[in-house]
């Protein structure tokens, strides 16, 4: 079975968020999450984001999604 996973470029994601002046809470709210830990776990690579979340993050940060996330195919 082929599985696609998103690999997070944690350093670039954190840098872009900080440059825009957003907190973890701001990012989580934008994603519709109740806890700021939701975004923190994505940013630190502890949790793989859903495709929709990755797209929302890149939209808010006004950067191409490929700056922060790469798709890796596993077989």
Question: Could you say what each language-model-derived stretch is?
Answer:
Residues 21-41:
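Short alpha-helical DNA-recognition segment
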Residues 17, 28-29, 58:
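The alpha-helix within a helix-turn-helix
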Residues 21, 45-58, 74:
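Short, basic-rich loop-to-helix N-cap that marks the start of a DNA-contacting helix
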Residues 61-75:
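Short C-terminal boundary/hinge segments that cap the last helix of small helical domains
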Residues 14, 25, 55:
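Residues within the helices of the helix-turn-helix
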């Amino acid at each position: 079975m082929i599985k696609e996973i998103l690999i997070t470029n944690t350093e670039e994601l954190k840098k872009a968020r900080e440059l825009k002046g957003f907190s973890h809470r701001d990012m989580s709210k934008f994603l519709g999450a109740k806890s700021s830990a939701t975004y923190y776990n994505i940013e630190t690579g502890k949790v793989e984001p859903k495709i929709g979340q990755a797209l929302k993050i890149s939209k808010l940060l006004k950067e191409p999604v490929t700056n922060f996330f790469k798709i890796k195919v596993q077989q």
